[in-house]
Amino acid sequence: VARQLLGNLDDLNEARVAFLLPAGFDYVAVQWGIWRAGGIAVPLCDKHPLPSIRYVLDDTNAAILVYSGTFDALLAPLADRDGLRLIRLEEMTVTQQTGALPQVDARRRAMILYTSGTTGRPKGVVTTHANLSAQVLSLVEAWKWVPGDYIVNVLPLHHVHGIVNVLCCALWSGACCEFLPKFDADEVFDRFGRGNITLFMAVPTIYHKLIARWNELDEAGKSALTHALSGLRLMVSGSAALPVRVLEEWQTVSGHTLLERYGMTEIGMAISNPYDGERRPGCIGQPLPSVQVRLAGENSEPVHGDSPGEIQVKGPTVFLEYWGNPAATSEAFTEDGWFRTGDLAVVENGSYRILGRNSVDIIKSGGYKLSALEIEEVLRTHPAVRDCAVVGIPDDTWGERVVAGLVVGGPVETDELSRWLRGQLPDYKTPRHYLFLDELPRNEMGKVTKKELKKMFTDQKPSEQ
């Protein structure tokens, strides 16, 4: 793969190489081939519509796009795109070329993953090879990965959770990683029943769905599954807060106390409950190896004792920069080099507990961190929408459910609006409820008061999708 990407070049020299491939061996071969050729890997989500894909290609100025023929129809409009070399996976050939591949310094940029922020549009998070190595080594040590481990992956591979926590840790350790093409509770239970799985990692939404399916089984089925789950050594939850009820119900299903951890695209994993030791409900544990964590006040002054503060992180796991956005990069760090996560926490009996998010414009739904501002920006392009505001409201399954308050200029069918939105945004960013209003709630400065909008959703019955 590396030689095919290089062509006549000696080194890709951090050229951005996007790839759109189903989870499996080909995904791994292309990702690592990009790195071996000296390129920057830009994984795309196989469930995103073309506008989302085009945005990433534009923002990174990608030189190459490697894709599976499965996506021929989706990517057809890119065929004549200037400056983009399209490589169809099925047309790649095994090369007989020999010779040295480039030496890639650990300080080079390795990957760009996209994450939503309060500026609205997704930002490209750049990690170096050294960053990725530090992230993986920290987890391998803390969670005691060994060559005999076997993990089944149900997580998306355009996200740090699936790429680093599962795939890279497994490869680094010499363990086995099996991919499921999509999440299906019965398929997951079938893999558990085979008896070779040692680890499993998922978002709270997946555990919620597994619990719901387990409750539908007869007593013999429940007993067999619980016995199979007892053979796993570790089960991890992350990417969103783990509801205590889900943790307790999963204990009943599996006999396991889920290990909850805390991380972000920008920092990898930073805090984790212990592999050995007490895992307290509602808490995320202690800093991982090589990670420095502090709580800080509004002016980034350290706070102590049981006072709440913003989680700030420093260390080799922390990303290099936001791609092409030096202003956002500068704003993300304190003057003394700590990354501002925007999450508030307290330390209780030596363990961190998350209190919430500094910004109401960040929604955590189903393991994704979504920007309300990005969704609003797209909604406002619909001809019938005069104004809008998007918020997240608590939901047992998703953590937070995306909802929208709308001011419209005439009759609007919510089904039609949702269909239109799904052509512009990934499905998981599409609001599940709409509230039609004469005007949005605002303060005296004219700013939308999103806390009041959230309350309106609890007081009224909105239209549901």
What spans do the regions from the language model cover?
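Conserved ATP-dependent adenylate/AMP-binding module captured primarily in the ANL superfamily
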Residues: 4, 48-77, 95-96, 135-152, ...
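Conserved ATP/PPi-binding loop(s) of AMP-dependent carboxylate-activating enzymes
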Residues: 286-290, 299-332, 351, 370
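Conserved pre-ATP/AMP-binding loop-to-beta segment of ANL
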Residues: 96-114, 120-121, 144-150
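Conserved AMP-binding/adenylate-forming
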Residues: 2-48
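Gly/Ser/Thr-rich phosphate-binding loop
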Residues: 143, 197-202, 212-280, 292, ...
